[in-house]
From Swiss-Prot:
GO molecular function terms noted in the UniProt entry: protein folding chaperone; unfolded protein binding
Name the UniProt record assigns to this protein: 33 kDa chaperonin
InterPro entries tied to this protein: Heat_shock_Hsp33 (IPR000397), Heat_shock_Hsp33_C (IPR016154), Heat_shock_Hsp33_N (IPR016153)
Disulphide bridges, residue numbers: 237-239, 270-273
Compartments, as annotated in UniProt: Cytoplasm
GO cellular component terms, semicolon-separated: cytoplasm
Its job: Redox regulated molecular chaperone. Protects both thermally unfolding and oxidatively damaged proteins from irreversible aggregation. Plays an important role in the bacterial defense system toward oxidative stress.
């Protein structure tokens, strides 16, 4: 099964729901950044939430999530858009702790609870929406739940999970977002709350082979879910050699000349995907000429 997400309605439109399988996407992030298990779980949870939140956007809109809880993992940064494309990184990928008292990876300890979760939506035409809430648990699912309630005034339940193999590879990853529309009946809310208390962790559901549609049925009941759209999900970075070259050109002829004399080459890495771009002295000379032409 490839990664994808579903958008759905349930209970005759009273509930909006999203569910995603992100195992391959989180695996690609782990491979690129060589994250250790606890860092993999933290980054994977953020990526999973990010791609589902991106699916709430339209057209070319995009969003950035910044999680900075003051923990040893540093900052988690995730970019996503309305097309199911997501990328992300963590400042300190080599963070791992013993399992917590529940036998799970200790994401809260890695993330920390002394900081903020920030969401910036780029809605085009210089129209930005910024929402920011304090991190309340560091487990991230609860933090995104709090974000929706506090910043967007939408009662929600967010579940995100990642299972990591002993060799650091990703066994399973996925998540869901359940949102109550205005006027949701009390009976509906009670039924959903009961199901949320009894279902297995979302990562376990993905591991057992459940599709995003089936995960929503577990959450909301069979026959209640009306799928509106399915969307492929993947790790996509928009960096390129051309963009890095443009950045070097923008330094100006003199600074490029200094690099050529001191280093003899230039190397730049993209934070989001860890791709490294190398420019030889000859290539720098060409970029210097382009910079001179611009001046």
């Amino acid at each position: 099964m490839s990664d994808y997400l579903v958008k759905a309605l349930a209970y005759d439109g009273q509930v909006r729901a999203y569910a995603a399988r992100t195992t391959d996407t989180v695996s690609e992030a782990q491979r690129r950044h060589q994250t250790w298990p606890t860092a993999s779980a933290a980054l994977g949870r953020a990526i999973t939430a990010g791609v589902m939140m991106g699916a709430m956007l339209k057209g070319d809109d995009k969003l950035t999530i910044k999680i900075d809880g003051g923990g040893p993992i540093g900052t988690i940064l995730v970019d996503s858009n309305a097309k199911g494309e997501v990328r992300g990184y963590v400042t300190n990928p080599h963070v791992h702790f013993d399992l917590n008292e529940h036998g799970k990876l200790d994401v809260a300890k890695a993330v920390g609870k002394n900081g903020m979760l920030t969401v910036v939506k780029d809605l085009g035409l210089r129209d930005f929406f910024t929402g920011q809430v304090p991190i309340i648990s560091g487990e991230l699912g609860e933090d995104f739940t709090y974000y929706f309630a506090s910043s967007e005034q939408v009662p929600s339940s967010v579940g995100v999970g990642v299972l990591v193999n002993p060799d650091n590879t990703i066994l399973a990853a996925g998540g869901f977002i359940i949102q109550l529309m205005p006027g949701t009946e009390e009976k509906t809310i009670e039924q959903i709350e009961q199901r949320l208390q009894t279902i297995p962790p979302v990562s376990k559901m993905v591991e057992s082979g459940l599709t995003p549609e089936e995960i929503l049925e577990e959450l909301l009941g069979k026959g209640n879910v009306k799928v509106l759209e399915t969307l492929p999900v993947s790790f996509v970075c928009r960096c390129s050699r051309e963009r890095i070259a443009d950045a070097i050109i923008s330094l100006g002829p003199q600074e490029i000349q200094d690099i050529m004399e001191k280093e003899g080459y230039a190397e730049a890495s993209c934070h989001f995907c860890n791709e490294t771009y190398h420019f030889t002295k000859e290539e720098l000379e060409q970029l210097k000429q382009l910079a001179e032409a611009k001046n």
